[in-house]
Amino acid sequence: MTDCSRCAGTTTSGPNHWSERIRDIADFPKQGIVFKDITPLLSDGPDFASALDEMAQPWRTTPLDAVLGIEARGFILGAALARELRTGFVPVRKPGKLPGRTLIQEYALEYGTDRIEMHEDALPRGARVLIVDDVLATGGTLRAALGLAAQLELEVVGAAVLVELQVLQGRQKWANDVPLLATLSY
């Protein structure tokens, strides 16, 4: 969980109408946090399509073998983006959710640690992937997905998020040699 109380009321960098569908939910999931809720955007077909089109645009000419989508909202965006980009989709899940053999990557939270995993045979070594999540906050989950990709010796061509919460400075902790694109910033 990240404290985004400082994100409330900020303006967006996105000029598109669809950005108005992302709403602030105060004190969720706990007191003092303002949650950026993308579900109203997801429920509107034309606006969701516009957001996906904008998210896909920078990657349309990039050769890809798959999109790695991070649980849970990264699944929604990642699978839709994979279809848009005509490539495969690989889920990156919380522990114990994937059958078979998996690779695990631990990452730091504000208080403690968590883990994500993916199938160890998800893609062949050297496959070109795009990592996708809904929100870049502190960057821990994205960096963990980058770690999983490194374990599989995948080539990460970039990362894409729908929303970046700039005040939480997740971008400053990101790998400089891997492009990280946010469709919308607060």
From Swiss-Prot:
Keyword terms, alphabetized: Cytoplasm, Glycosyltransferase, Purine salvage, Transferase
EC number(s) from the headed UniProt entry: 2.4.2.7
InterPro entries in UniProt: Ade_phspho_trans, PRibTrfase_dom, PRTase-like, UPRTase/APRTase
Description of how the protein assembles with itself and partners: Homodimer.
Pathway membership, UniProt: Purine metabolism; AMP biosynthesis via salvage pathway; AMP from adenine: step 1/1
Listed GO MF terms: adenine binding; adenine phosphoribosyltransferase activity; AMP binding
Catalytically driven reaction(s): AMP + diphosphate = 5-phospho-alpha-D-ribose 1-diphosphate + adenine
Family indicated by similarity: Belongs to the purine/pyrimidine phosphoribosyltransferase family.
Keyword Cytoplasm: yes
Pfam families for the chain: Pribosyltran
BP GO annotations: adenine salvage; AMP salvage; purine ribonucleoside salvage
Keyword Glycosyltransferase assigned: yes
Role this protein plays: Catalyzes a salvage reaction resulting in the formation of AMP, that is energically less costly than de novo synthesis.
Gene (name only): apt
Name of the featured protein: Adenine phosphoribosyltransferase
Cross-referenced PANTHER family: ADENINE PHOSPHORIBOSYLTRANSFERASE
Highest taxon in the source lineage: Bacteria
